[in-house]
Amino acid sequence: MPCSQLLGDGNTEVLDPLAWIHAQQNRVGLMANENVYGWRYYGQERPPFALEPGQGQESVWDYPRPPRIERVSREVIVRVGEVVLAQTHQACRVLETASPPTFYIPRMHVKDEYLYRAGGSSRCEWKGTARYWTVSVPPVVLERVGWSYEDPHPEFESIRGWLSFYPARIECHVGGTRVMAQPGGFYGGWITPDVVGPFKGAPGSSGW
């Protein structure tokens, strides 16, 4: 997400993976103490409170800082009701310590007729200045629900003009699974069943 914006365990008995993820988030306040640990983890080691990833899962505490970009072959879909706003097998995800991945979609795979430039901007130390987008699919209008980097820093040139969206406010899917939003309301990470935390944005995580 725009970094400065203010706006499990593989158990096969778990039938609803997103419900299990929600339970992870609720546990964060019990597992982490920001005053003890602070922000000193950058992907080289996991903090004591990090959940152990199961088979086929990733820990967000193994992601680097500064973040890196990774290509995604799974289908990514963003929709408003019955209208598919974006659909692609060529997305990228940005991986940063403690946060679930943020997915960016090529502009050519987003329906421009529903996009309107919104006011304001924010700045990320890694990616540059984010511009915001409103989605209008009458009668639904979602203000500042997406963002893009139109002139990113050189390391993020590959996502120039690509769009990401807040899954807390618009329906997002990866590989056929509905995405869950990063906790806290400040961030735009996409939580899928193959990613474990705890995640930045939950209670007790402001020092991460």
Describe the residue ranges of each PLM region.
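Terminal leader/tail segments of proteins
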Residues: 3-208
